[in-house]
Curated annotation (Swiss-Prot):
It comes from Escherichia coli O6:H1 (strain CFT073 / ATCC 700928 / UPEC). The keyword Cell division applies. Cell division inhibitor that blocks the formation of polar Z ring septums. Rapidly oscillates between the poles of the cell to destabilize FtsZ filaments that have formed before they mature into polar Z rings. Prevents FtsZ polymerization. This is Septum site-determining protein MinC. The keyword Transmembrane helix does not apply. The lineage of its organism: Bacteria, Pseudomonadati, Pseudomonadota, Gammaproteobacteria, Enterobacterales.
């Protein structure tokens, strides 16, 4: 046990950055409502950073902050602010001004190629081959998510498609984030804090005991979450 009441440690978190391209709060509010409706499991009440670098017109920051907060998103900071007056308004509200890392120079565009003939659509998959640590949030939009290592407690996996975890699953797994009720979750060692498919969820104490710590497959059957052995 530490002898001091506090301890400072470096850490990193995965946050969504909302780039504002419109200075009208009502327009931003509606655009965010539409976006949240597409992936509520990922975006509802999510902490976000607002990037204001693209705003050229004067901004009513109080109204803008209220418009964003009214959607349920939690603004934890602002980046890309170069206007001194706007920066003062933001800081007056108690929000930190965040400095982003330097952006890499864009790569030259590849030479145009003739379109391939008779191509077959491919379903993309996001692959994570490193451990997912506590505090990390990984989202796979419009595709499946495969993790080949362990997922720590406090980590969160979100996918619009299926989720596969080939390691110990101690965090949270939310498949079908955009509402697809045909998605499934596959784990080789199910010890999750929460599992969810299209909004139907179990907390850890709701996972049947005979499947806890075992290889398991979860899916919806008649709109109810079910689990079976993963053979």
């Amino acid at each position: 046990m530490s002898n001091t009441p506090i301890e400072l440690k470096g850490s990193s978190f995965t946050l969504s950055v909302v780039h504002l391209h419109e200075a009208e709060p009502k327009v931003i509010h509606q655009a965010l409502e539409d976006k949240i409706a597409q992936a509520p499991a990922f975006l509802k009440h999510a902490p976000v950073v607002l990037n204001v670098s693209a705003l050229e017109a004067p901004v009513n920051w109080s109204a803008m902050h209220k418009a964003v907060s009214a959607t349920g998103l939690r603004v934890i900071g602002v980046s890309g602010c170069k206007d001194a007056q706007l920066k003062a308004e933001i800081e007056k509200m108690g929000l930190p001004i965040l400095t982003e890392g330097k952006e890499k120079a864009p790569r030259p565009a590849p030479a145009p190629q003739a379109p391939a003939q008779n191509t077959t659509p491919v379903t993309k998959t996001r692959l994570i081959d490193t451990p997912v640590r506590s505090g990390q949030r990984i989202y796979a939009p419009q595709c499946d998510l495969i993790v080949t290592s362990h997922v720590s407690a406090g980590a969160e996996l979100i996918a619009d498609g299926n989720i596969h975890v080939y390691g110990m699953m101690r965090g949270r797994a939310l498949a079908g984030a955009s509402g697809d009720r045909e998605t499934q979750i596959f784990c080789t060692n199910l010890m999750a804090e929460l599992v969810s498919i299209a909004g139907e969820y179990w907390l850890s104490d709701q996972i049947p005991a005979e499947f806890y710590g075992k290889a398991a497959r979860l899916q919806l059957v008649e709109n109810a979450l079910t689990v079976q052995p993963l053979n």
